Swiss-Prot record:
Family that this chain belongs to: Belongs to the G protein gamma family.
A Pfam family annotated for this UniProt entry: G-gamma
Predominant location category: membrane
One Gene Ontology biological process: G protein-coupled receptor signaling pathway
UniProt modified residues of type Cysteine methyl ester: C87
Lipid modification (S-farnesyl cysteine), residues: C87
Residues carrying lipid (S-palmitoyl cysteine): C86
Name the UniProt record assigns to this protein: Guanine nucleotide-binding protein subunit gamma
Residue numbers covered by the propeptide annotation in the UniProt entry: 88-90
One term of GO molecular function: G-protein beta-subunit binding
Annotated keywords: Lipoprotein, Membrane, Methylation, Palmitate, Prenylation, Transducer
Membrane topology: Peripheral membrane protein
Places the protein is found: Membrane
Length: 90
């Protein structure tokens, strides 16, 4: 019966050590304050164009539309016609 409390104490010690390791890892993680995060978001939104807000950035030029898929469709059709294989790997 003398071993049972020792085993329980050993299990408790192991759990505490695991918790300490988790807390050390969390403490070592790089942190950013809320004000710095907000400044980073403001900087990103002011330097990257978002055409979903045309009041701010205007409308994109026809050739500069990043959401236009006609170029991709034309290239796919050409590459499909040139090969005799049944599949195209991209």
């Amino acid at each position: 019966m003398g071993e049972l409390p020792y085993k329980i104490q050993e299990l408790k010690l192991r759990r505490i050590e695991e918790l300490n390791n988790k807390l050390r890892n969390e403490l070592a993680r790089e942190r950013m304050t809320a004000s710095n995060a907000c400044l980073s978001i403001i900087d990103y939104t002011s330097t990257h164009k978002d055409y979903a807000v045309p009041e701010v950035w205007g409308y994109p030029m026809v050739g500069e539309n990043p959401y236009n898929n006609t170029m991709r469709k034309n290239n796919f059709a050409r590459s499909h016609e040139e090969t005799s294989a049944c599949c195209t790997i991209m």
